[in-house]
């Protein structure tokens, strides 16, 4: 009996070798410096902002180097799989401007020469590599029951020892092939563990592309590589997949940093080169005066659906995330206001080593900048696409007056300081409702925002006087001259210096008169340019309201 017999008993139908797969999945023919990266989620839930953050880093590094960005689905834990999670991942990344060069394209479809890209369909590949390790005596079947493992763990903790299956506690590590075969033939359950070559006296030193040099004790654990159900553990599948798919860089959350010694050791035992690693900081948020991890349970903004429902343009979210990835992006954007964000080069060594702080106020500022640069036609299209799903009443109203709405979305946009009225589409209704009688007529007296200097009766007198003077067919300068004439007749100042010098001689400023007109037409104290609003509304609508 030998290791060969043991390997053949465990995997009787596996006739392929690692060499076969190395030939089947050759090195990629890419230019020097091109990076191959992946987004590799587990389909155990719907996408969150941390996933978009990680995916964006991988996508930018791949594509800015002329490389490959692919989607792999890590579905070895099929009990936790959520229906629709794969399609949600693909849709989410597409909506945020990230399309995969290869990999999974749907629940049951994929593209690319390194398929399959779903781990549950790669079982025979993993088995071929495990069979090879068994042949070489580098892995072994472990027959410890869950009860034995729990008892061992309790004993180790009581004795203040590191819990786990290693060294003297690896009960079946040195079991002979003959004895292992007997147990398997007797029907005993088992997992397969890799024999760790780790030395308790040594440390593993590695270069993390974000954190710099990192150092850990070598891994001593004989980690499970094939579970009782025959599927690989994440650790082993990751090593095999990244090797065969020719991944050059693995960018993942810093919660995986402690697993780095295990993964580097696996590549060593497999006899293959490890990819380069970078561990990105956890997304944090301020909670009072302290920081904490962004929570799927506590924080609605952790879910990608939050940004769709609120109506943040995907470009806004991307540009905000680029700010988190590299703080230098903000300066670059200021210097290149009209450039495509793809022109910015993401650099890992300039990324914060500590937690990335997520700030909705900052996101809103970024989003206002993004939207204010959009052409009115683009704003119209994006807004109506959003409203069709999330605000059907506004969708019907806005699309019924398409030409007018494109004018509305262009108010005060073409000057040196364009208005920044909204950060997300759910704010649009409040900003433009007064263009629609259907919404304006629902307002009550309590909704009307008068200038603080005016009482209601005085505002009514102003409107009565202005109604007589109003002329639709004038340019802006003439319109303002007419407004000032009304102001003077009613005792309001048109010169701020004179008003400040003798305020008791006037009821107020011409701005108060304009404020009364604004309130009559819009019910709001703060709107875009009043003359432009009136021209867009049209003479009939204006006269009806004043």
From Swiss-Prot:
The keyword Protein biosynthesis applies. It is found in: Cytoplasm. A motif ('HIGH' region) lies at residues 41-51. A motif ('KMSKS' region) lies at residues 293-297. Its main location: cytoplasm. GO terms for cellular component: cytosol. It is an enzyme of class 6 (ligase). It holds the Pfam family Anticodon_2. It catalyses: tRNA(Glu) + L-glutamate + ATP = L-glutamyl-tRNA(Glu) + AMP + diphosphate. It comes from the Bacteria. Belongs to the class-I aminoacyl-tRNA synthetase family. Glutamate--tRNA ligase type 1 subfamily. Monomer. This is Glutamate--tRNA ligase. The gene is gltX.
């Amino acid at each position: 009996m030998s290791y060969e017999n043991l390997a053949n008993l465990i995997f009787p139908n596996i006739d392929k070798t690692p060499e076969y797969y190395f030939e089947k999945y050759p090195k990629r023919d890419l230019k020097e410096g091109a990076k191959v990266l992946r987004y590799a989620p587990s389909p155990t839930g719907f996408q969150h902002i941390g996933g978009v953050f990680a995916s964006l880093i991988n996508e930018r590094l791949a594509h800015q180097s002329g490389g490959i960005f692919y989607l792999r689905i890590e579905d070895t834990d099929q009990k936790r799989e959520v229906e629709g999670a794969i399609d949600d991942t693909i849709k989410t990344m597409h909506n945020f401007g990230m399309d995969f060069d290869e990999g999974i394209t749907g629940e049951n479809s994929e593209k690319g020469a390194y398929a399959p890209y779903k781990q549950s369909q790669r079982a025979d590949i993993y088995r071929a590599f495990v069979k090879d390790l068994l042949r070489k005596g580098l892995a072994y079947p472990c027959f410890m029951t869950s009860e034995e493992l729990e008892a061992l763990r309790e004993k180790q903790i009581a004795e203040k020892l590191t819990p786990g299956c290693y060294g003297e506690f690896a009960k079946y590590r040195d079991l002979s092939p003959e004895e292992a075969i007997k147990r398997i033939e007797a029907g005993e359950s088992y997992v397969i563990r890799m024999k760790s070559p780790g030395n308790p006296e040594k440390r593993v030193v590695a270069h993390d592309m974000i954190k710099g040099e990192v150092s850990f004790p070598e891994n001593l654990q004989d980690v499970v590589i094939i579970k009782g159900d025959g599927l690989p553990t994440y650790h082993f599948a990751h090593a095999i997949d990244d090797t065969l798919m020719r991944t050059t860089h693995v960018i993942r959350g810093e919660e995986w940093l402690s697993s780095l010694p295990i993964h580097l050791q696996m590549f060593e035992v497999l006899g293959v080169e490890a990819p380069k690693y970078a561990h990105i900081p956890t997304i944090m948020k301020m909670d009072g005066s302290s920081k904490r991890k962004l929570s799927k349970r506590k924080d609605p903004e952790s879910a990608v659906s939050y940004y769709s429902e609120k109506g943040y343009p995907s470009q806004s979210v991307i540009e905000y995330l680029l700010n988190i990835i590299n703080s230098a992006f903000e300066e670059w954007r200021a210097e290149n206001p009209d450039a495509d964000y793809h022109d910015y080069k993401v650099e890992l060594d300039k990324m914060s080593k500590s937690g990335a702080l997520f700030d909705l106020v900052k996101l809103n500022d970024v989003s206002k900048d993004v939207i204010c640069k959009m052409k009115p036609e683009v704003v119209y299209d994006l807004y109506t696409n959003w409203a069709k799903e999330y605000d059907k009443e506004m969708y019907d109203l806005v699309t019924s007056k398409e030409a007018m709405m494109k004018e509305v979305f262009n108010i005060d946009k073409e000057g040196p300081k364009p208005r920044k009225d909204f950060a997300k589409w759910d704010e649009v209704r409040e900003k433009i409702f007064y263009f629609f009688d259907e919404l304006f007529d629902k307002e009550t007296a309590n909704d009307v925002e008068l200038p603080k200097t005016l009482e209601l009766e005085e505002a009514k007198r102003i409107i009565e006087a202005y109604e007589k003077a109003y002329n639709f067919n004038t340019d802006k300068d003439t319109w303002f001259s007419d407004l000032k004439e009304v102001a003077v007749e009613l005792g309001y100042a048109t010169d701020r210096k004179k008003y400040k010098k003798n305020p008791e001689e006037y009821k107020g400023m011409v701005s108060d008169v304009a404020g009364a007109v604004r309130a009559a037409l819009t019910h709001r104290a703060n709107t875009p340019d009043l003359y432009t609003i009136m021209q867009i509304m049209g003479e009939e609508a204006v006269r009806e309201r004043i």
